[in-house]
Amino acid sequence: MKVLYIQSGYGGIYSYFDRWAEECFQNTHTEYMIADKPEAESLMKIEAFQPDFTLMMVGDRVPHDWLTWLKGKDIPVYVWLTEDPFYMDISLQVIKLADAILTIEQNAALYYQELGYQNVYYVPIPVNHRLFKKMGTEHSYHSNLLIIGYPYPNRVQLMKEAVHLPFTVRVIGKEWGKYLPKKVLKQPHIDVVSTWVPPEQAVHYYNGADIVINAHRPYHFAFNQNTMRIKNASFNNRTFDIAACEAFQLTDLPAAHPFSSIISYHGMNDFKEKAAFYINHPEERQKAAAANYKETVPAFTFDELPAKLKAIHLALS
């Protein structure tokens, strides 16, 4: 199996996804080639390489140049829709030129199948379990409640409620300082880190938290491009990162196969009750976290990605 991997071209966490994808091909001795932009020299090398298929992550923009060239050369295209369902409007443009559709959202997969597309696969963004793992951390990383990520409205509301609980709360992510009231920011038990933290730091925060709050991006967020308003029912990649650390998480999506051990909350009162319960019952946190780990590692690690791609390739051959 010869894989052409087109780098996403995005910054932030996507630069890590690109690196981890390349590492997983190396670790599994998969024959691969990496390309960035469709420039003349790269295109010549691709033709000489003769890939069996192309894998490309697609988020909030359509890679027209790549899709046009690849189709013109009859190189099968596997699009990995890593922002479903939030940019479904973009995805619906891209899948018209795809030979296989890989999506991180099971509801999106069902929708594509309803439209008549056949080669549709649920493939969540896996975890780099060599980085995200259980480890001891300095006391400065400890918190009772931790949330990492962009301040979506549901997360902001959650934090406004969490500050009234008798626990230390740490919030990490760009722009949080803009969305939380000043009286919240001044609370001594609240620590707001208004910057993006790379995975190498995030792993320490996960390991240092009693509870990681994993509230998902809303499907109807104002800046989404999801005209069909497809709801997200699948866990985000942060779920697997936290689980691989054997850290305890509370999430707002209901547990479902293949992640039946995830602990969910349903509404604000349930969140506060479960936060209090699990803070005071560390043995229950450890039990749930261990179950989360077993459901995630090794099944949803980057090392397993080449085997999943090979299975798809064989099914389409």
Swiss-Prot record:
Summary of the knockout phenotype: Spores produced by the deletion mutant are more hydrophobic than wild-type spores and lack the polysaccharides layer. Mutant spores do not have a crust.
InterPro entries membership: DUF3880 (IPR024542), YkvP/CgeB_Glyco_trans-like (IPR055259)
Inducing factors: Expression is GerE-dependent.
Disulfide bridge partners, by residue number: none
Matching SUPFAM superfamilies: UDP-Glycosyltransferase/glycogen phosphorylase
Pfam families assigned to the protein according to its UniProt record, in alphabetical order: DUF3880 (PF12996), Glyco_trans_1_2 (PF13524)
Function: May be involved in maturation of the outermost layer of the spore. May act as a glycosyltransferase that contributes to the glycosylation state of the spore.
Name of the featured protein: Spore protein CgeB
UniProt lineage: Bacteria, Bacillati, Bacillota, Bacilli, Bacillales
